[in-house]
Amino acid sequence: YAADAAYLVDRCDSNEYLENLSNIFRKEAIDFYIPGTDVELIFCAVNKQLIKDKFSVHTIISSIEVITFSNNKYKTASFLRENGLNYPRTDYLKDIDIEGIEYPVIVKPSVGCRSIGVYKINNLEELTPHLENTKDIVIQECVGNEDEEYTCTVVKIGDELSPVLALKRVL
């Protein structure tokens, strides 16, 4: 990645995080802030008005409700299905017929980030340990390959939508 500057900041659950942002906002004369990681989204949505009032910086971020909804893989897949959009087949692990699974599949928490608890499963033997605790675990059709990841962003300000930015990241 290319950037004019880079900063190491404390975790967003740290008391120092907002102070870290404040220093960057002042030093770099920031007008708009777009949080870059899943873990800071809720913090930034909650503190959006504070950041604007205290630092005159506009945080470009969805509402807490949208973030909470979209963090849930099952709800997101259901929304995509209901709106005629493509999505990987997604079910709660507790609700599926184990014998009918077409491998490989992805097993992961319904709500999570940073690939924590995400497993590519190639057969029943690999799936078996995950069957012990199926609470809030989803199973998804495996798309792409393990060397790449897809992400998509749309920004809405008022009634205006930006073009869709779809990225394929090579891991």
Task: Give the residues covered by each predicted segment.
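Short loop/helix-cap segments at secondary-structure boundaries that form the rim of catalytic
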Residues: 1-3, 97-101, 129-133
